[in-house]
């Protein structure tokens, strides 16, 4: 379809706007047939201005394939040959070369900022030397039985941190003793790869127990772990004594902790208190923010590694049946085996560091990247994103420097820069499967390194993350769950796309943005599961029965077992409705006093190490709302899959016949407007398979859903927020009218009828409801174009009258041939200085309204001619008028078509933008911010989600919008949106095509052309720079929101008062800070939607004569939600003039007052009285801000154009009392209260 304006006129428009306002035009007046306005936004990152330097590093991946051979650049059958592919590849490499230099400068600056202070390092090293001397003073301890150990510690401060199960003297026939350990530093501090951490860092010190303390079979049944616990307790006891002797006990605190949250690995943590008069010492390292971990390790290969492989059982238990085999004990085996490998891996990494100049810098980048996404080396089997921290990242990088490919080819080279090393590891994580389809093998033994086999990727997966060391037989990724690995892989993929993005600067998103501070931003849905857990002996019978001896052996702790069980149950129940699941044991602790044996052992019973379970989901938007969970097909003999399905779902399972004739086992779910289907599934599955008494809380989800106005339609309470049927009904009504008008016999044929109303793009706050004519969005705008004609008048006023004549003719035809349609005319004042615009308002028999306005090929030409012929002092006003015309007539078509497509691609965009509009209207901002601007701001988290995922829930999308606004420095940063559908992300396809030398088909080329190119992006940035050069503080124009549709960036954001823009930012910051400080709950959500009226200079409370809630098409909260409101109008009034009786007069009143007092006041009100106007929809408010110029006295001028009164002979002040009386008089009987500050 095409708009009516000729291309020549459009080019004239572009040239004039660039020349006069230094901005590009937004509308390519003709719209190509079938063009898709899709969207993939780009968050405007503050680009650092740096000089271009010579490239000292290549950003070419070592595994990149050769470019296709050069062939003739001919195009046939929609194909692009390899020559053009090569040209694209070269252009891309040029952009990447420049980006690589920029990244290098940013990385250098970042590394400098996080570098440890040398004086802090020296300070803590001084204490480490002292600690070494103290440890050497601890006396040896002869062999003791367990009974003697218990007797020794009976009256001591220190308790032995035995791991569960605690040994019993009569069953323990091995001895415990202490001999001096071998002491060494390990970890990042030893590698000099440590960085400054705001919450402090830890230094890992390894104390290796002598080999003679162990027997050959101590690796079985916790024996070596119990020996370590006694060894640690004895060391702690004497360390306390020696610290007191050296007068260091006044500022040093000792406590036990589980290293990496592994309950099988207790350590001693030493920290400092703040220096006081009594604790001043050269050894006090409090200001360094370091703590010291004393790890008790085993000698290297003290136990035969093969006996501790992940598939072996090393915990023997009594079996009820001899035929029953004991399960593997991978967690236990890893804990024992890894305790003997600390020093080995330090040597391995140190050797790699010496060979690779940028190894440490790349390690720091990896650490920052992981920390910002919530990953660590902690055990993830009891929840959290653990199992992959700095240590695992460095081991993987070292392995890839020695191979890593399918043919043992090197993935990384020792001469790579830190950026290339980091990108190489990220690419490997993103593209290689180390869980299901394969694993990576490497050799860490530093001996005979010249002949050491290379790392190799093996096409054999073990269904668990695997990075296997052939030297030590350790799977480095044992601590990582499948769920944690899947999320890591997805983050790596997202980061790789950001690294490959040559258009936008993504440095901040990759390294600087912490996405783990607030779960509701990181995850789409969060459910708090309260389990009936008390003391261990009181554990609910059904839950205890599933945690038998076999489960204890495999999972070690109940926390690990519960996390595994809940994950599996939720994953099976939700299937492809979700992408990822993460379990968190809220309240889990790893630190405990040296006076206690373990965490929570101080309460006289075995309490569990968590308060409740939080289930965190990342949703698949395209599948989450389906009504049916389909299982296996039905057959005469029940298959294993069918039996599992029926057993899992129980009474919910049923047989259903589908349209294709198949009969399938399935579960059918009901929808609700107050919560997603996923909530029902989670409740059912967890209560059935985990605990009948489990309490699953999701009140915040319901709260956000309930803030969306419920349409007064049948069964609306049972309709999902993703359901667009009410919008489809309106579109169907429009289609019928569309056909009627197209068939009319008019002097000029109708060329196109283009809908541009917000309901056509599914973004109107209130859903379309028949006969709801009190809704401000009831009349949906439509652009009507006729065929080209040279007879259109050559003057704007005459042209508008000619348009009106055509609309009159349409009304006559409609009245004569379609009597069920009713219509009337109204004057349109949306374009300043053009008061001759008339619109035709048509009411359909289905109960919907449409407002038709006419566009011709002459309009744009006449507006531009008026600007060219005007005096210089009048041109700014006329240019602003032309912008309004462009936005209303030309750009609105592309905007509507683009967002309509995007609403289908991003399922949650529609409800999110509608909720965002309600928030804006609650705070009286929507009257100043156009619908289009609100819609473009709300689309940012969808088209440019980095570093987060695309929103998969209403609350997640809404909170991300607020988060973006709170961080958007619109004075310095433009918002540039790449409006492309998510499935059109063909960067990976593009790279694969280039690398393989294959041809790019026309479809791929079209998708490439739809994205913003680097030149277009830089052009938009130049427009923003020009704008800020003329308006550096954003006084006249604050929000620069640009896209391919609107490279000028100002179409929808011009005319917003500065106080309104700053208030929007301030409100978003307050909202985000409130939620991060106090969490997401019913109270904080209510506060989000509570306006702060005390900030205004005056507030006028209004009440309309009649309530408008029902006539706005909104179902009242007090009514039964399964029936409609009978008081709502079911037809239009006989006299169409009566329509205005049920429309909110506040809008016209505020519009008039803003025109009258535009020089001195900024007035605001709520636009949607049916939504925010109280229970009946009859309450509104007018708030006023006095402009700063009129806050105090100033000199009198003739052209002040406002009501003032004299202070003295020269100065005047605003006559507020007179203005307030005038406003009250205009409001008349509607005013019920008038407050001033």
UniProtKB/Swiss-Prot annotation:
It is found in: Nucleus, Nucleolus. The modification Phosphothreonine is found at residue 60. Pfam families: Nrap (PF03813), Nrap_D2 (PF17403), Nrap_D3 (PF17404), Nrap_D4 (PF17405), Nrap_D5 (PF17406), Nrap_D6 (PF17407). One of its GO terms (cellular component) is UTP-C complex. InterPro entries: NOL6/Upt22, Nrap_D1, Nrap_D2, Nrap_D3, Nrap_D4, Nrap_D5, Nrap_D6. Gene3D superfamilies: 1.10.1410.10, 3.30.70.3020, 3.30.70.3030. GO terms for molecular function: RNA binding. The modification Phosphoserine is found at residues 10, 58, 64. It comes from the Eukaryota. Residues 1-78 are annotated as: Disordered. Keywords: Nucleus, Phosphoprotein, Ribonucleoprotein, Ribosome biogenesis, RNA-binding, rRNA processing. Its main location: nucleus. One of its GO terms (biological process) is nucleolar large rRNA transcription by RNA polymerase I. Residues 61-78 have a biased composition (Polar residues). Interacts with snoRNA U3. Interacts with MPP10. Component of the ribosomal small subunit (SSU) processome composed of at least 40 protein subunits and snoRNA U3. Interacts with UBP10. Belongs to the NRAP family. Present with 3260 molecules/cell in log phase SD medium. Involved in nucleolar processing of pre-18S ribosomal RNA and ribosome assembly. This is U3 small nucleolar RNA-associated protein 22. It comes from Saccharomyces cerevisiae (strain ATCC 204508 / S288c) (Baker's yeast).
